[in-house]
Amino acid sequence: DCEFSYRDSIFRRSAAGKYFITSIKIKLSKLPPKGPFYAGVETYFQNNNIPTDNITAAQILNAVAKIRADKLPDPKLIPSAGSFFKNAIISAKQADGLKDAYGDKIPLFDLNDGRYKISTGWLIDKAGLKGVELHGMCPHFKNALVLTNVSARNFNDLALAREEIKSIVKGKFGIEIEQEPLEI
C-alpha cells in the first residue's frame, strides 16, 4: 500500500505532506538472509574471508556497521545533516558526456530505461566542494553527500549551503541535484 522502496514511498510522492508517521511495525524473516548483497558488503566478506553460503543476520549487521563507520562521520563527534542529497538521475547523453570528460570510472548505475543514476557525492567532489566549508556547513571529506556542521548557527545557514552546492554542481555539470531530507 505504501509502495516502499529504496529511499522512496507514497509519502514522498502522492501522499507527501498528508500524513505524519508516528510508528511502524516490521515483520522480520526467521530464515537466514540470502545474497547477493550490495557490493560493499560482498567486498567486506571477501576481504575478511567470511564465506557467504551460510551468512547470518549478525554478520551482515556487523559488516554494514563497519562499512558505515569507515564512510561516515561519527555523529557523536561531528554534527551533521546526514546524507543530504539524492543520487541524481541523468540521461544517457549526459552519462556519455561525463564518460568522455572523466573516463569510464564514473559511478553510474544503468536504470535500463535510457537513464542513469549517478553518485551525487562524486559530482560534489569533482565540483571541488568535498571538505570545503560553505555557510558553516561542509560536504564531509569521506562522503560528500553528508553535510557536516562546522559552524552553522541555524537552518538559514544550512539552506544557503544547500543552494550554493546545488548551484555549483549545476554550473559545472548541468545536473540538478535534489535534497534528500524532507522539511517539515
Each model region followed by its residue ranges:
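Recognition helices and adjacent regulatory flanks at domain boundaries
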Residues: 167-168
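Phosphate/pyrophosphate- and phosphate-bearing ligand-binding catalytic cores of soluble enzymes
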Residues: 3-156, 172, 176-184
